[in-house]
Amino acid sequence: MALKNFNPITPSLRELVQVDKTNLWKGRPLKTLTKGMSKTGGRNQQGRITSWHRGGGHKKLYRVIDFKRKKIDISAIVERIEYDPNRTAFIALIKYDDGEYSYILAPQKLSIGDRVISSQAADIKIGNCLPLKSIPIGTTLHNVEMKIGKGGQIARSAGTSVELVGKDSGYAQIKLRSGEFRLVPLDCKATIGSISNPDQKNINLGKAGRNRWLGWRPHVRGVAMNPVDHPHGGGEGKTSGGRHPVTPWGFSTKGKKTRKNKRTSKFIVKKRK
């Protein structure tokens, strides 16, 4: 996919850069593989804001994605590549030889008419899903499981991938884009190739309204608030906050580590850069 630039006939078009979606399916998604979504506006069940700056946005249908690739040893053909408003990657509608349809994450270079399969010993080909023990070292992967049978969790967003760098003592060692090296059980599945839409990182929304369409509300600075609302609030005239940057709840920000799950830290061989 390429990037689209626009003639600056309006101010919002001057900086706008979008991903070219001319080769994607232009119709509606398959109805049997969609679900309705209700908006939360960033509120929890008590009505309190738990995710700031969320709200509004265009209506969406959730596309049910098969992250587990649970139909084993049944070949499928790629019917079409589609846009999915719920993720940055594109998705592929595949039709199995037994007639069932499914959505999967579309890797780069996957085309309409290609055949894919999930198997214990499939060919090392774009879109095929195999256990890590059956994949040669040096292969580029996406949608990698962390727990056997749970479904892919690693490398699912646009343009991402991991590299298989080693196997030892029942675990595969993978290198993530962040520079982290992590151990994953050899029986976990992964799909061959990199995720589609690598140009997502180069887009420019061009105007605030386009962010509102995506469900994002304005980000208000703490120094622009009152003291009751934020530790940086208040002061006579414009101030710089007067302290090291903190969250609205007083915790240090700007690089403070937030990872709590020590239980799985033993699987991280080398921390990210």
UniProtKB/Swiss-Prot annotation:
Which GO molecular function terms does the record list? rRNA binding; structural constituent of ribosome; transferase activity
Biological process according to GO: translation
**Cross-referenced SUPFAM superfamilies, in alphabetical order?**
Nucleic acid-binding proteins (SSF50249), Translation proteins SH3-like domain (SSF50104)
Q: Where is the composition biased (Basic residues)?
A: 254-273
Which organism does this sequence originate in?
Rickettsia prowazekii (strain Madrid E)
Q: Which domain of life is it from?
A: Bacteria
UniProt keyword Coiled coil present: no
Keywords from the UniProt entry: Ribonucleoprotein, Ribosomal protein, RNA-binding, rRNA-binding
Which family, according to UniProt?
Belongs to the universal ribosomal protein uL2 family.
Q: What is this protein called?
A: Large ribosomal subunit protein uL2
* Listed Pfam families: Ribosomal_L2, Ribosomal_L2_C
Query: Entry's InterPro entries?
Result: NA-bd_OB-fold, Rib_uL2_dom2, Ribosomal_uL2, Ribosomal_uL2_bac/org-type, Ribosomal_uL2_C, Ribosomal_uL2_CS, Ribosomal_uL2_dom3, Ribosomal_uL2_RNA-bd_dom
One GO cellular component this record assigns the protein to is: large ribosomal subunit
Per its UniProt record, what PANTHER family does this chain match? LARGE RIBOSOMAL SUBUNIT PROTEIN UL2M (PTHR13691:SF5), RIBOSOMAL PROTEIN L2 (PTHR13691)
Start and end residues of each stretch annotated as Disordered: 228-273
The free-text function statement in the UniProt record for this protein reads:
One of the primary rRNA binding proteins. Required for association of the 30S and 50S subunits to form the 70S ribosome, for tRNA binding and peptide bond formation. It has been suggested to have peptidyltransferase activity; this is somewhat controversial. Makes several contacts with the 16S rRNA in the 70S ribosome.
Q: How does it assemble?
A: Part of the 50S ribosomal subunit. Forms a bridge to the 30S subunit in the 70S ribosome.
